[in-house]
């Protein structure tokens, strides 16, 4: 497993920002208290498809799933695949739990907390797909080490994906865009940018739904959105 070093700017070993916003509604709190413990990954030990879902199935992992729209869409689209989502913001977790309950999805596991702590316990080469969509940009240079797209996490992504597996990244922040591309250029030995034309990165790929955050970025703030697919060599 990855060793996290205190103060090392190439790794992440703590969460930043809020963990809860407005108070949860009564039923949301009920889901957090009752459904979440049933579908959370184990607190210790390896995180495998067999342990989570009782069988060896393709395994997906989403880091920071927000309100869960993408995670739920993908899980519904691929019912024979297993999905793990990690989100530190409790309101987002509650929103995702509501969708899981409503759609009766049995192939999702949810972690309310640090994604890298769980990802670190996934066996190397076990993931089919890994998603990082609209992470917190931390736009100030002094906060750059807080960005999820840094050498330490990207090295972990490469370790956990199987050969031919896919890492999907999306952002609407130009500072994060430049930073992410700079980081990925240092990992071309592990990842190949999947692109077929010059405008691919401006067009949402098939099977990649628009989330509430992305819709807000476009319609309220007028942001462009960029989409990237990287294949594990």
Curated annotation (Swiss-Prot):
GO molecular function: tRNA (guanine(46)-N7)-methyltransferase activity
Source taxon at top rank: Bacteria
Keywords: Methyltransferase, S-adenosyl-L-methionine, Transferase, tRNA processing
Family: Belongs to the class I-like SAM-binding methyltransferase superfamily. TrmB family.
Source organism: Erythrobacter litoralis (strain HTCC2594)
Name the UniProt record assigns to this protein: tRNA (guanine-N(7)-)-methyltransferase
InterPro entries: SAM-dependent_MTases_sf (IPR029063), tRNA_(Gua-N-7)_MeTrfase_Trmb (IPR003358), tRNA_methyltr_TrmB_bact (IPR055361)
GO cellular component: tRNA methyltransferase complex
Swiss-Prot/TrEMBL catalytic activity: guanosine(46) in tRNA + S-adenosyl-L-methionine = N(7)-methylguanosine(46) in tRNA + S-adenosyl-L-homocysteine
Positions of the catalytic residues: 136
Binding-site residues, S-adenosyl-L-methionine: 62, 87, 114, 136
Function per UniProt: Catalyzes the formation of N(7)-methylguanine at position 46 (m7G46) in tRNA.
HAMAP family tied to this protein: tRNA_methyltr_TrmB
One Pfam family cited in the UniProt record for this chain: Methyltransf_4
EC number: 2.1.1.33
Pathway(s) where this gene product acts: tRNA modification; N(7)-methylguanine-tRNA biosynthesis
Gene3D superfamilies on file: Vaccinia Virus protein VP39
Binding residue positions for substrate: 140, 172, 211-214
Enzyme class, spelled out: transferase
């Amino acid at each position: 497993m990855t060793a996290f070093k205190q103060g090392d700017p190439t790794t992440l070993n703590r969460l930043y920002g809020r963990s809860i916003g407005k108070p949860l509604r009564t039923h949301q709190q009920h889901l957090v208290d009752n459904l979440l413990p049933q579908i959370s990954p184990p607190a210790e030990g390896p995180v495998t498809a067999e342990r989570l879902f009782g069988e060896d199935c393709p395994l997906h992992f989403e880091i920071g799933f927000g309100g869960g729209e993408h995670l739920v869409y993908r899980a519904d689209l691929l019912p024979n695949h297993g999905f793990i989502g990690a989100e530190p913001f409790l309101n987002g977790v509650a929103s995702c739990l509501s969708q899981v309950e409503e759609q009766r999805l049995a192939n999702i596991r949810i972690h309310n907390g640090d994604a890298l702590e769980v990802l670190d316990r996934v066996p190397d080469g076990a993931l089919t797909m890994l998603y990082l969509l609209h992470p917190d940009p931390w736009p100030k240079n002094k906060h750059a080490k807080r960005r999820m797209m840094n050498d330490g996490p990207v090295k972990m992504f490469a370790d956990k994906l199987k050969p031919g597996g896919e890492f999907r990244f999306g952002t609407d922040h130009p500072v994060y865009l430049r930073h992410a591309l700079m980081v990925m250029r240092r990992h071309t030995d592990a990842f190949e940018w999947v692109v077929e034309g010059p405008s691919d990165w401006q067009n949402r790929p098939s099977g990649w739904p628009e989330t509430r955050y992305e819709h807000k970025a476009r319609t309220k703030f007028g942001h462009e959105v960029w989409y990237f697919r990287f294949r594990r060599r």
